Amino acid sequence: MKKNIIAVVGMAGAGKSAATRYVLKKYGWPKVYFGEATFDRLKEEGLEVNYENERYIREKIREELGMAAYAKLALPKIKKLLKESNNIILESLYSWEEYKTIKDEYGEDFKVLAIYSSPDARFKRLKNRQRERPIKDYEEFKTRDRTEIEGTNKGGPIAVADRTVINEYDLNHLHKEIDEFIKKL
């Protein structure tokens, strides 16, 4: 039986979580959230959830386990869920090395859905998330983008995506694009 492992990728504020929530709600696919390891470690170390601490922990985890760290940490959960479901959605796969790890494991069953939004749209969304993960200003936003692209090799998975959805409109447009992608699997 064919398996569908879909990674939703994109820059911060592009709409990855909105896309993932939609797939969870409409299709009932189980989710593996790569960022869970970061939040678990923040809690273990008693650190506040903010951009600086998240970055510190991500770098620490990657220093310990390599650039494919989050994929390595997620693989046991993915394997377990694939015993129960033929479809899984992966949220927040970042690095090229993570992409290669999952691609090597699952081959053609693994697909990437990139969500793209302009920097201005993403900044506005992130400013509206102030309670979740505060962002101070546009300069911090640009620094965060640079760090994610250069420090986590984030561009690779976005560049090789099987489908790119432009998320500049409303949620109905985003949902329609996701439905079209899933129909073609």
Pin down the residues of each PLM region:
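Conserved lysine of the Walker
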Residues: K16
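ATP-dependent small-molecule kinase phosphotransfer cores
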Residues: P30, F34-I89, L93-D104, D120
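Short, well-ordered beta-strand core segments
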Residues: K31, V112, R163-I166
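P-loop (Walker A) phosphate-binding loop of NTP-binding proteins
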Residues: M11
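Conserved phosphate-donor/acceptor-positioning beta-strand/loop module used by diverse small-molecule
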Residues: E91-S92, E105-R129
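Small-molecule kinase domains that catalyze NTP-dependent phosphoryl transfer to phosphate-bearing small molecules
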Residues: A68, R131-E177, F181-K184
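Hydrophobic positions on the alpha1 helix immediately C-terminal to the Walker A/P-loop
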Residues: A19
